[in-house]
From Swiss-Prot:
Matches recorded under InterPro entries: Elongator_complex_protein_4 (IPR008728), P-loop_NTPase (IPR027417)
Keyword field: Cytoplasm, Nucleus, tRNA processing
MF terms (GO), sorted A to Z: phosphorylase kinase regulator activity; RNA polymerase II complex binding
Annotated pathway: tRNA modification; 5-methoxycarbonylmethyl-2-thiouridine-tRNA biosynthesis
Subcellular location: Cytoplasm; Nucleus
Transmembrane segments: none
Biological process annotations from GO: regulation of transcription by RNA polymerase II; tRNA wobble uridine modification
Name of the coding gene: Elp4
Assigned protein family: Belongs to the ELP4 family.
Protein name (record): Elongator complex protein 4
Organism: Mus musculus
Keyword tRNA processing: yes
Disordered: annotated span: 1-49
Annotated coiled-coil segments of the chain: none
């Protein structure tokens, strides 16, 4: 009986609390992510410039710098994931995706880490494309990257003004939006580069000829690069274990030509090499760093040069997102009139399955890219209409000739001839 009284009292107390909450005008239900981060509250979504939560799985997303590619990847690139770009045959178009990713980080004030074994990172950043911004957005961007801290009410006024205006998908856009467009014919302003924070890893500067750092697990270049990335992640508080004291930010990592002989790897030279596991070991450790930090990584790799295709399959399995570029240069499709409006095909080989068993791959097929004077665009591949006169359509001359022959035949029938000459 006492237990029943206790149970009844608990039910009564919960009902009274619910009634008091209803009388107070507040609901006891709270939307996910809107709860406070204090004791008893739910997790609070991070508010970082240049990011937004995914509507599918709640993951924090960053833009790749190409809005069309963001749409194909489910809204953007998830923080803590790896994007692999399989280079085209002559490495003409894949560096553009790399530069888009880096330029997007500068516009949003993210920290960059550029690693290359071929070109100096400072030179790579100087060749980034300039953003397409209107006059008001340029003023806002200067306020964000200036050394002086602007007043909070001024920032709120600018953000409130532009978020109510409809945004066009082509042309200049605001710097506060997710994803921007860039002008490939212009270079990013020097003022933005000076105000941005970046780290450069140039392999020849970190390896001396007499240095013996080879191991049975990793090459010397991979070891130095992992140490450099790990130091940047931990020193500046991008890892979750050591939160940043200041406002949280995103680390964008870009690695060029990974797996090529420039990195000391021989998977592009031999089919059965003894050290074919070094690249996969590197990706294992790198993904562990990404998963536990506020960072996103893009890697370009010459997959067409890898002799053993099983290595390419393993690298794809170790990547969260895989995008391949197929150029028409030097192929039969370059002179094919069906592909005259495009410069190559883009293959979305893998889409991340984060907190899901499956992913939607319905909109990632039959894609082509086109390089214009200022823009790199991704379009749905379609065949042009057949308007030729030889296929399914007669010309006026042929039609007139057939009419004349038909008229002559009919006149001969009228004169009593039994046979018609066709």
């Amino acid at each position: 009986m006492a237990a029943a009284d206790t149970c009844g009292a608990g039910t009564l107390s919960s009902r009274s609390v619910a009634s008091e909450a209803g009388q107070g005008g507040t609901s006891s239900f709270q939307r996910k992510g809107k709860a406070s981060g204090g004791p008893g509250g739910g997790p609070r979504l991070l508010s970082i410039a240049g990011t937004r939560p995914s509507v599918r799985n709640g993951q924090l997303l960053v833009s790749t710098g190409l809005p069309a590619l963001d749409q194909l990847l489910g809204g953007g690139l998830a923080v803590g994931t790896l994007l692999l770009i399989e280079e085209d045959k002559y490495n003409i178009y894949s560096p553009l995706l790399f530069k888009y990713f880096m330029a997007e980080g500068i516009i949003n004030g993210h920290t960059l880490l550029v690693a290359s074994a071929k070109e100096n990172p400072a030179k790579i950043l100087q060749e980034l494309p300039a953003p397409l911004l209107d006059d008001n957005s340029k003023k806002e961007l200067e306020d964000v990257h200036s050394a002086k801290t602007p007043e909070p009410n001024v920032n709120m006024k600018i953000a409130w003004r532009y978020q109510l205006q409809p945004k066009m998908e082509v042309g200049p856009v605001s710097s506060s939006r997710f994803g921007h467009y860039y002008d490939l014919s212009k270079r990013i302003p020097w003022e933005l580069l000076q105000s941005s924070k970046w780290h450069g890893f140039f392999l020849p500067e970190h390896i001396s000829p007499d240095l013996k750092g080879e191991s049975c697990f990793l090459s010397c270049g991979y070891m130095r690069l992992l140490e450099f990335i790990q130091k940047s992640v931990y020193a500046e508080g991008f890892d979750g274990a050591n939160p940043q004291k200041k406002q949280k930010n995103i680390l964008r990592i870009g690695i060029q030509n990974l797996g090529s002989p420039l990195w000391g790897d021989d998977i592009c030279c031999k089919e059965n090499c003894d050290n074919n596991h070094r690249l996969t070991k590197f990706l294992y450790i790198l993904r562990g760093l990404l998963r536990s930090s506020l960072s996103a990584c893009i890697i370009t790799m010459p997959a067409h040069l890898v002799q053993n295709k099983s290595i390419t399959t393993r690298v794809r399995n170790l990547s969260d997102t895989v995008v391949g570029l197929e150029s028409f240069i030097g192929s039969e499709r370059e002179t094919n009139p069906l592909y005259k409006d495009y410069h190559g095909l883009i293959h979305i080989r893998k889409i991340p399955r984060l907190n899901n068993l499956t992913c939607d791959e319905s909109d990632v097929k039959d894609l082509a890219f086109k390089l214009k004077r200022k823009l790199f665009t991704i379009e749905r591949l379609h065949l042009p209409p057949d308007l030729s006169d030889t296929v399914g359509r007669s010309s006026k001359q042929d039609l007139a000739a057939s009419t004349a022959r038909l008229g002559a035949g009919c006149s001969s029938m009228a004169e009593g001839k039994k046979h018609l000459d066709f």
